[in-house]
């Protein structure tokens, strides 16, 4: 087995991860002669419930603030043992106990139907209050970690500054040794751990928490592949001061995570869409349920090779990292996606004059890196960047040609690079389409504008390109004047050094690749 352990840090990341786990749950097959294309052992752990029954639960640790779990209980039905005689419970206190309880959050109608084994009602943006409202899986009690030091959405003490997250991690780690308490039990269960996948926001306090967590992980698991999905919120309707704070948080997160992670992929919903995308994508950008669904579909598809059974198109997170990181320091990648009906091939276009220069997909998920970027950006694109390396994952294309192409198809899927200055590329393929469980919002449309309700063909791209150099310089010019004198020079230098790794001339020092 090549297990992957997931860490989920914060409310927005848990929305994202809930879609991810619901998708993994949908891959299970129950017919006697039906075999799944997915190796479930990569993300799921076997165990025993309180009654001795076998269980299969995610290899994940979920962190959220007080009030962030909604109606989700730490002890679920598989581990709940009812004690009818409280006198039998062990206690060192013989006096009268006074128990204070907060008003419990009522489970959503969707959750109540799942618990009762009934057909659940269709979810809506109004009925989804928390990520747990559309959750379809059981978690091990060890997976649930509530941080009581901060309340969710508090206006008195908001969890929004990078330094607050850094401080919280330091205090908790000093008291509990977080890695040893929370992650090590899952790591010790793994026969051959493939890597650690982390989902976190990077433009708030969770960025500071994540940065120090990853630093500890690197100390404990020096050679383990660590992938970080760095979520960033949009700027629409956000005050100038909050925008600047988020950019400072992001700059600190990028420089700190860059030092330790094997791969960091910043992601966000584009601020505007092309007319075609507005036709085929029905997205409520004010709904975390909607936006996290789109991002999760891209992430789940991009990492699909890491859990496929098909040896030809299966690959590890470590190998994909090596393909993207050509020179040892290009560890920040960009995520793109295209989707369509399963009877069609998802749209893409060549970046340069030949396919060797890379492919550009419909939707670019790189975040805004300066105050004006979100206003001028459409589908995430400026000018066409020089691509250094690209890893493509294509799923659900039912053209009928795959089995007949034989050797030519196999040759096309191999890692290709024709010359020292050309993009290196690798493409993974599977007929397994992206599933749409009933917990997933109806955001995908066909070219006629009609809902896609069962599954979707999808292509994703992870790439390293020269555009990041200009973006990092733009971020640097915005945030350095906002940082205290004691940290300003260090942060400025670190952003500049990161930008230098993505010049179009690679190690030549050429500035020709700057796009901003």
Give short role names for the model-derived ranges.
Residues 1-201, 205-516:
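Terminal, contiguous helix-loop blocks that mediate binding/assembly
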């Amino acid at each position: 087995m090549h297990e992957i352990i997931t860490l989920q840090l914060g409310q927005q990341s848990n929305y994202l991860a809930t879609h991810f786990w619901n998708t993994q749950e949908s891959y299970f097959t129950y017919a006697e002669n039906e075999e799944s294309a997915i190796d479930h052992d990569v993300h799921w752990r076997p165990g025993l419930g309180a009654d001795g029954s076998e269980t299969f639960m995610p290899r994940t640790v979920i962190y959220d603030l007080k009030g962030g779990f909604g109606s989700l209980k730490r002890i679920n039905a598989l581990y709940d043992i009812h004690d009818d005689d409280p006198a039998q419970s062990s206690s060192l206190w013989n006096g009268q106990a006074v128990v204070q309880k907060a008003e419990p959050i009522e489970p959503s109608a969707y959750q109540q139907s799942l618990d009762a084994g009934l057909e659940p009602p269709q979810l809506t943006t109004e009925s989804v209050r928390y990520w747990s409202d559309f959750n379809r899986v059981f978690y091990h009690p060890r997976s649930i970690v509530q941080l009581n030091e901060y309340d969710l959405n508090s206006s008195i003490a908001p969890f929004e500054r990078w330094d607050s997250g850094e401080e919280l991690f330091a205090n908790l780690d000093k008291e509990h040794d977080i890695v040893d308490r929370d992650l090590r039990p899952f790591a010790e269960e793994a026969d051959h751990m493939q890597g650690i996948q982390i989902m976190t926001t990077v433009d708030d306090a969770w960025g500071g928490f994540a940065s120090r967590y990853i630093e500890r992980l690197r100390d404990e698991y020096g050679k383990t592949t660590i992938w970080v999905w760095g979520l960033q919120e949009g700027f629409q309707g956000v005050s100038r001061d909050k925008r600047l704070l988020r950019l400072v948080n992001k700059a600190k997160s990028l420089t700190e995570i860059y030092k330790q992670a094997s791969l960091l992929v910043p992601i966000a919903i584009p601020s505007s869409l092309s007319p075609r995308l507005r036709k085929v994508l029905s997205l409520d950008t004010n709904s975390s349920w909607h936006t996290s669904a789109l991002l999760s579909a891209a992430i789940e598809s991009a990492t699909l090779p890491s859990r496929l059974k098909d040896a030809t198109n299966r690959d590890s997170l470590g190998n994909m990292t090596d393909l993207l990181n050509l020179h040892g320091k290009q560890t920040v990648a960009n995520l793109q996606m295209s989707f369509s009906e399963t009877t069609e091939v998802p749209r893409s276009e060549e970046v340069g004059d030949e396919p060797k220069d890379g492919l550009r997909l419909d939707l670019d998920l790189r975040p805004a890196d300066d105050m004006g970027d979100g206003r001028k950006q459409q589908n995430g694109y400026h000018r066409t960047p020089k691509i250094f390396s690209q890893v493509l994952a294509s799923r659900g294309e039912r053209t009928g040609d795959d089995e007949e192409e034989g050797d030519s198809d196999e040759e096309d899927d191999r890692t290709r690079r024709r010359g020292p200055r050309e993009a290196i590329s690798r493409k993974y393929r599977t007929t397994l389409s992206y599933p749409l469980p009933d917990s997933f919002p109806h955001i995908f449309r066909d070219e006629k504008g009609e809902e896609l309700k069962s599954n979707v063909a999808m292509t994703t791209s992870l790439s390293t390109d020269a555009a990041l150099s200009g973006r990092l310089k733009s971020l640097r010019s915005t945030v350095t004047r906002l940082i205290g004198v004691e940290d300003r020079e260090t942060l400025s230098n670190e952003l500049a050094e990161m930008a230098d790794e993505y010049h179009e001339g690679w190690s030549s020092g050429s500035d020709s690749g700057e796009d901003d």
